[in-house]
């Protein structure tokens, strides 16, 4: 596995985590 694909995988994982956190915050704001 090359360094570039390694970086790309880490970037995708970080993007998904950050967006899921944002969605979770919005959902918790709406529910309250």
Swiss-Prot record:
Task: Work out whether the entry's keyword set contains Lyase.
Answer: no
Q: Which UniProt keywords apply?
A: Host membrane, Membrane, Transmembrane, Transmembrane helix, Virion
**Presence of keyword Transmembrane:** yes
Topology term for the membrane: Single-pass membrane protein
Localisation = Virion; Host membrane
Residues crossing the lipid bilayer are 4-24
A single cellular component GO annotation: virion component
* Known role: May initiate with G7P the virion concomitant assembly-budding process, by interacting with the packaging signal of the viral genome. The assembly-budding takes place at the host inner membrane. In turn, G7P and G9P are present at the end of the filamentous virion that emerges first from the bacterial host.
Family in the record: Belongs to the inovirus G9P protein family.
The name under which this protein is listed is Tail virion protein G9P
The protein's organism comes out as: Escherichia phage If1
């Amino acid at each position: 596995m090359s360094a570039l694909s390694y970086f790309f995988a880490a970037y995708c994982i970080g993007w998904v985590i950050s967006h899921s956190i944002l969605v979770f915050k919005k959902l918790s704001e709406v529910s309250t």
